[in-house]
Amino acid sequence: MQQKTISLGNIDIANDKPFVLFGGMNVLESRDMAMQVCEKYVEVTQRLGVPYVFKASFDKANRSSIHSYRGPGMEEGLKIFQELKDTFGVKIITDVHEIYQCQPVAEVVDIIQLPAFLARQTDLVEAMARTGAVINVKKPQFLSPGQMGNIVEKIEECGNDKVILCDRGTNFGYDNLVVDMLGFNVMKKVSKGCPVIFDVTHSLQCRDPFGAASGGRRDQVTKLARAGMAIGLAGLFLEAHPDPNKAKCDGPSALPLSKLEAFVSQMKAIDDLVKSFEEIDTSN
């Protein structure tokens, strides 16, 4: 099957090309922290020769509790994103939750993300697609990999063929997630070769059934990421934090920023090895 390539300047995103790291922090906590985190990612990825896109949210609109930190909001968030681009020359991915956000966000960032909980909201999907920006679709935890083809079709029907698909885990009973490793290739197939990436951080969430925030399994981030990279993917989606225990969102799943270089080095080694193999057709 022919694999599609999406180009962002000098970055090529495709299942059969070197993986792209979509990395940053869960939510913009401050301008200074965003600068610190982005600088570290840029240093590490440049040293290792890994293509890089910065990620963060300006508004976590789906927090469990009304009292939880959501972010600085769109206006302030876009200012921070623009400063990161001007300072480090990075490409940026962020999510939108409302139709009115689509166009102004697409004018600043390079990839706009369709959140998993909103992935079947047709009006939002259409508004995002019509910006002409690259769209990253998070697979809903409740949706099978095979159903992702319908979301891709919605976007393409609006005249936008720049679609990335992202797996962030699948419901496993109540308050738990698992990753279906066979699902990555299903998504490649039903999307006719769209780039598929793996959000390892959010796949590690494990909720307290009566709590107001997600727990996580940070100690397993490297092992789960290794397994995903062995499939042969277009990219890895990762959140890191200088002090995960003090993060304002999803700290229990975040990689300590100090471990970033060792982590990315291992992912690159696996990606290089897997993509050096010749494909073996076992379908007949």
Curated annotation (Swiss-Prot):
Main location (coarse class) = cytoplasm
Cellular component GO terms, alphabetically?
cytoplasm
Which keywords does this chain's UniProt record carry? Answer: Cytoplasm, Lipopolysaccharide biosynthesis, Transferase
EC number, as in UniProt: 2.5.1.55
As for subcellular location, the record says: Cytoplasm
What Gene Ontology molecular-function terms does this entry list? 3-deoxy-8-phosphooctulonate synthase activity
Classification via InterPro entries: Aldolase_TIM, DAHP1/KDSA, KDO8P_synthase
A GO biological process this protein is involved in? keto-3-deoxy-D-manno-octulosonic acid biosynthetic process
**Which reaction is the catalytic activity of this chain?**
D-arabinose 5-phosphate + phosphoenolpyruvate + H2O = 3-deoxy-alpha-D-manno-2-octulosonate-8-phosphate + phosphate
What pathway is this protein said to act in by its record?
Carbohydrate biosynthesis; 3-deoxy-D-manno-octulosonate biosynthesis; 3-deoxy-D-manno-octulosonate from D-ribulose 5-phosphate: step 2/3; Bacterial outer membrane biogenesis; lipopolysaccharide biosynthesis
Q: Name one Pfam family in it.
A: DAHP_synth_1
Enumerate the Gene3D superfamilies for this protein: Aldolase class I
State the family named in the UniProt similarity comment for this chain: Belongs to the KdsA family.
- This chain belongs to the protein called 2-dehydro-3-deoxyphosphooctonate aldolase
Q: Which organism is it from?
A: Glaesserella parasuis serovar 5 (strain SH0165) (Haemophilus parasuis)
